[in-house]
Amino acid sequence: MATTSTTGSTLLQPLSNAVQLPIDQVNFVVCQLFALLAAVWFRTYLHSSKTSSFIRHVVATLLGLYLAFFCFGWYALHFLVQSGISYCIMIIAGVESMHQCCFVFALGYLSVCQITRVYIFDYGQYSADFSGPMMIITQKITSLAYEIHDGMFRKDEELTPSQRGLAVRRMPSLLEYVSYTCNFMGILAGPLCSYKDYIAFIEGRASHMAQSGENGKEEQHGKAEPSPNAAVTEKLLVCGLSLLFHLTISSMLPVEYNIDEHFQATASWPTKATYLYVSLLAARPKYYFAWTLADAINNAAGFGFRGYDKNGVARWDLISNLRIQQIEMSTSFKMFLDNWNIQTALWLKRVCYERATFSPTVQTFFLSAIWHGVYPGYYLTFLTGVLMTLAARAVRNNFRHYFVEPPQLKLFYDIITWAATQITISYTVVPFVLLSINPSFTFYRSWYYCLHICSILVLLLLPVKKSPRKKNTEENAQPSWAKKFDERENSLGQNSFSMMNNVCNQNQDTGSRHSALTQ
């Protein structure tokens, strides 16, 4: 029988028993499906052309809080406590230091909640616990604090193009703030979005901003707002296939079997490598399901439009969190990270990597580990990830240019690097799945720490070769997972900047109510 352990509603316990899934997971999926229907209703009946921004904020917030309390019970109060105290900090600390104070508090509050959940209540269990939504809220709080600091304290010439475009030039009202952090579209699974993108969506400006940002032509504004139906349908199909794969195949290929004593003693190296790859491949569909469904919910509400491609097809990937085909066909560590958990990668870039004064790669991986939680396996994964990232960068910079031509040689290079990338990624993230330190070291011992040793040798033996310098040295220093987003962010920044005066010129008594917010 499925477990009845949950802090939220037990109304769906009969359904949980029928499908043999834990009640917390059933609550999560049902609430997300409800959010999908609510999103369609929200776009149809509460469209920005039919009602005020105030009503849209209120409804989005109340629905979000209802879903939170249904899933997590009184633990959902943590969402309001974290958000509320952070808002007060923004007001009290002021624009000069709010970003630092909010960063320390929000991340600290999240860590305390994670420690309490992990070491007191639920060690070693994957569950739809309340700290999951808090991770997204933490991203939003910290992002907004930095965006307000950039927009209201720093000079424009001190900002990068993306920071300038995302900068918030006035303090949000309490309603806008809570709507941003706790709206029904993103309260359970995100994804992260910038405050300016969210406000533009609520106020009905998102479509115009995205269209004008395509090529700057005024006539683009005359286009009707595109329908998200095709994009939502496609994403729901991906969700269905991912869920089917997870329920039927994933349980047959447990990652834990990689540390089974009999398997370790009898399996050949090719067998070990093959099972390592397929077991981690089978572990990914649950993320594909959750993130793609969250993206579909936002799209169904009308949020996520990013303009048109060169063929005139509407793109609904403004806040997409992954690109499955690119992930599975990755031929480098860089390419994998570019396409996995995209919005979190953007958050890490914006609040840490771009602002770090030393060792930005190490600081970024460390922040990522803290944000994910307190399991030792997370830290082991991210420490290994630093080593693998630096080694992969060194190999790429030293050898890739030898395999560009002819096409046959490049194909051979792509096949080899695909296999190496998939094994390296799998090797790196095993502790992330196993969670505990002893099983993680058991796995690495069974592989004789071979990839750790190879990476260290690569860093010691290969000469340091940097990529060709760009005009902006700060851009040149960006991590692999960050560079891909520059063009997109710059474009969005220009779009947002073009709307800046409209935002700043809102009436004073609306502006006086504004205070603080996040990503």
Swiss-Prot record:
GO terms for biological process: lipid modification; phosphatidylcholine acyl-chain remodeling; phosphatidylethanolamine acyl-chain remodeling; phosphatidylserine acyl-chain remodeling; phospholipid biosynthetic process; regulation of chondrocyte differentiation. Its EC number is 2.3.1.-, 2.3.1.51, 2.3.1.23, 2.3.1.n7. Disulfide bonds: none annotated. The active site is at N341, H372. The lineage of its organism: Eukaryota, Metazoa, Chordata, Craniata, Vertebrata. The chain crosses the membrane at residues 22-42, 61-81, 88-108, 184-204, 236-256, 288-305, 365-385, 415-435, 443-463. It is an enzyme of class 2 (transferase). One of its GO terms (molecular function) is 1-acylglycerophosphoserine O-acyltransferase activity. This is Membrane-bound glycerophospholipid O-acyltransferase 2. Acyltransferase which catalyzes the transfer of an acyl group from an acyl-CoA to a lysophospholipid leading to the production of a phospholipid and participates in the reacylation step of the phospholipid remodeling pathway also known as the Lands cycle. May catalyze preferentially the acylation of lysophosphatidylethanolamine (1-acyl-sn-glycero-3-phosphoethanolamine or LPE) and lysophosphatidic acid (LPA) and to a lesser extend lysophosphatidylcholine (LPC) and lysophosphatidylserine (LPS). Prefers oleoyl-CoA as the acyl donor. May be involved in chondrocyte differentiation. PANTHER family: LYSOPHOSPHOLIPID ACYLTRANSFERASE 2, PORCUPINE. Its main location: endoplasmic reticulum. InterPro entries: LPLAT_7/PORCN-like, MBOAT_fam. One of its GO terms (cellular component) is membrane. It is found in: Endoplasmic reticulum membrane. It catalyses: a 1-acyl-sn-glycero-3-phosphocholine + an acyl-CoA = a 1,2-diacyl-sn-glycero-3-phosphocholine + CoA; a 1-acyl-sn-glycero-3-phosphoethanolamine + an acyl-CoA = a 1,2-diacyl-sn-glycero-3-phosphoethanolamine + CoA; a 1-acyl-sn-glycero-3-phosphate + an acyl-CoA = a 1,2-diacyl-sn-glycero-3-phosphate + CoA; (9Z)-hexadecenoyl-CoA + 1-hexadecanoyl-sn-glycero-3-phosphocholine = 1-hexadecanoyl-2-(9Z-hexadecenoyl)-sn-glycero-3-phosphocholine + CoA. It holds the Pfam family MBOAT. Keywords: Acyltransferase, Endoplasmic reticulum, Lipid biosynthesis, Lipid metabolism, Membrane, Phospholipid biosynthesis, Phospholipid metabolism, Transferase, Transmembrane, Transmembrane helix. It is a multi-pass membrane protein.
